[in-house]
Amino acid sequence: IILNNRESFKSKYGILIDKENQLFESKAMSNLDEKLMFMVEKEIFYSRNFDLPLERCVVWTVNDKDEIDNVLNMNVYGVVTDIGDKL
């Protein structure tokens, strides 16, 4: 995992999102719990319906170095990759 803001991590729980229909319920929960983190599948992250707090999202699995840089520059919390040893 590549993390942008490791020092600010205060959550011990989160939601795994791998289907687009989970976004609406997750958004409602994000408004109720500011410590809730989201592990978001890459294609869901790029969905036009994606509207979660970026600073609480980890995007998976991103295996292209340029794409990793682009996603991290969007201020997400982190990225999961299979190529960490090649970066």
Where are the language model's segments positioned?
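Short loop-to-alpha-helix "cap/lid" segments that border enzyme active sites
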Residues: 1-87
